[in-house]
From Swiss-Prot:
Basic and acidic residues: compositionally biased ranges: 283-292, 318-336
Protein name: T-cell activation GTPase-activating protein 1
Biased composition (Low complexity): 250-262
Bilayer-spanning residue ranges: none
Originating species: Mus musculus
Compositionally skewed regions (Polar residues) per UniProt: 90-102
N-terminal signal peptide: none
Region (Disordered): 81-147, 160-212, 242-293, 311-339, 414-441
Length: 505
């Protein structure tokens, strides 16, 4: 039973498979038949269209003079131009005004383009007479070759037309080209700005010109630029290719180059545009000094991306004369009263050091290391040297866990202290003064050591805020190299000042 069932299923599968194969084959055959039928239908339609077109052409050839008359050439030309321009054939003047090269000036008279159709209407030409005889001779023939040749002849006679009619504003003579374009107005932005024809007319019109040539230099209206045009110096005897010089060329200085007055493309002689303004050109006035010219083209901006602003000693020397010593001492004393010891140092205070006898370079930058070296150079013994400030800051440590800022300040400012305090890398307030500057007198010369030094240098019109620098950056190199004490002054460590800073806050 199971075997018979399996046999039936196998037969059904084979039948289905055969049916699918036949369906696929039939679909392919149908597609091929459809393509062939479609191609045959297209060919039949094309043949029918060809026959109809041939019959229509033969009818037009046989009855052309009865339909169009004897002046078929002029009529066909007008209709072809109207079909191209999409205008009315009754008004021929619209073809002239629609031209892109025409001017809006009503004073400019239209050229001989409107008269050209009237010239063509004088009568049948010899070509048309020959066409008439050929037409009557070929109508008797019934072959397709004769009809095709007649169509070609008729097409050539119709298409052959005067270029001056299709472009009515292109005048044939050179006098008509030079005359209207030289007197033509530039109607872009100023109607009173005209172009002169020659050098004599330009000399007479200088008083009537509302604009100077420096603002709007005139452009020579020549129809074609010479190939070998190389102009180095403009002189009074130099002439343009048409024999006349415009106002810009007659009044230009001998040292100016050709690039000072750019000339537009001479491809269309009917249109003249304004050239660039003087501020966009590279022409420089020789009478003005160079510094006055660069004042308008240069922005004096000082953008410094470094951490430390470089200083110029010339600026500081001028400001140090006007800055009084009393004002400097008063500002430093006011800043030293702050508990955080944040020093705000402007450019005048920095540059006042140049008047003390230090030889500073033009790009000397302020830093903690340079400050220690500068002070140690001026007074070698007091305050302590740069090496002592770095190497012996950890000597003589004592437990000061219960100290406050006030008690440490009173301890540091005792008159029994012989040596000024050595800077610590993390202290809160240990002494007076600024790390970057020293007092002008030996009595008021002190030190200020803080966690950070906040330098704000005010320049002309702007102030740059520099990043915070810690004193510990300059002291981490040789901190543990030498710990031998050479003096008995007490210094504070960072862990000893935690309670002091917290109590103050």
């Amino acid at each position: 039973m199971a075997a018979t069932t399996a046999a039936v299923v196998a037969e059904e599968d084979t039948e289905l498979r055969d049916l699918l194969v036949q369906t696929l084959e039939n679909s392919g055959v149908l597609n091929r038949i459809k393509a062939e039928l479609r191609a045959a239908v297209f060919l039949a339609l094309e043949e029918q269209e060809k026959v109809e077109v041939k019959i229509l052409v033969e009818f037009l050839i046989d009855n052309c003079f009865e339909i169009f008359g004897e002046n078929i050439r002029t009529r066909s030309r007008i209709t072809s131009d109207d079909s191209l321009e999409h205008t009315d054939s009754s008004d021929v003047s619209t073809l002239q005004n629609d031209s892109a090269y025409d001017s809006n000036d009503p004073d400019v008279e239209p050229t001989s383009g409107a008269a050209s159709p009237n010239r063509q209407l004088e009568g049948p030409t010899p070509t048309m007479a020959g066409l008439d005889t050929r037409g009557h001779r070929d109508t008797c023939e019934s072959s397709s070759e004769s009809s095709v040749s007649m169509v070609v002849r008729l097409k050539n006679s119709i298409v052959q037309q005067d270029r001056r009619f299709s472009e009515p504003n292109m005048s044939p003579s050179r006098e008509c080209l030079v005359g209207p374009t030289s007197k033509q107005k530039l109607t872009r932005s100023e109607d009173s700005f005209t172009l002169s024809q020659d050098a004599s007319c330009s000399e007479g019109d200088e008083a009537e010109d509302p604009f100077t040539e420096e603002v709007f230099p005139a452009v020579d209206s020549k129809p074609k630029r010479p190939v070998d045009l190389k102009i180095k110096n403009w002189t009074q005897g130099l002439a343009s290719p048409q024999g006349h010089i415009t106002k810009a060329f007659s009044r230009s200085s001998p040292g100016e180059s050709l690039g000072s007055s750019p000339v537009p493309s001479p491809s269309c002689p009917k249109r003249n545009f304004f050239t660039r303004h003087q501020s966009f050109t590279t022409k420089t006035d020789k009478t003005k000094p160079q510094r006055e010219i660069r004042k308008h083209s240069m922005l004096f901006s000082f953008a410094s991306h470094k951490k430390v602003l470089p200083r110029t000693s010339s600026i500081g020397s001028e400001k140090s004369k006007d800055f009084s010593r009393d004002q400097l001492q008063k500002d430093l004393r006011k800043e030293s009263q702050l508990s955080g010891r944040i020093v705000q140092e402007n450019e005048s205070e920095i540059q006042s050091q140049t008047s003390l006898g230090f030889s500073l370079s033009g790009t000397w930058a302020l830093s903690v290391d340079n400050t220690f070296q500068l002070v140690d150079m001026r007074k070698p013994g007091s305050p302590p040297s740069y090496e002592e400030a770095i190497y012996y800051q950890t000597s003589g440590l004592t437990a000061y866990g219960g100290q406050t800022v006030g008690s440490m300040r009173s301890r540091m400012f005792k008159p029994s202290t012989a040596v000024p305090p050595v800077p610590s890398h993390h202290g809160g307030d240990l002494s007076e003064g600024t790390p970057g500057g020293h007092r002008l007198s030996s009595v008021t010369e002190h030190w200020t050591h803080s966690q950070t030094v906040h330098v704000s240098i005010e320049t002309q019109g702007r102030s740059e805020l520099h990043q915070l620098r810690t004193v510990s950056e300059s002291m981490q190199k040789a901190k543990l190299d030498c710990l031998g004490p050479q003096h008995s002054h007490l210094v504070f460590e960072a862990d000893q000042l935690c309670c002091a800073r917290e109590s103050y806050i």
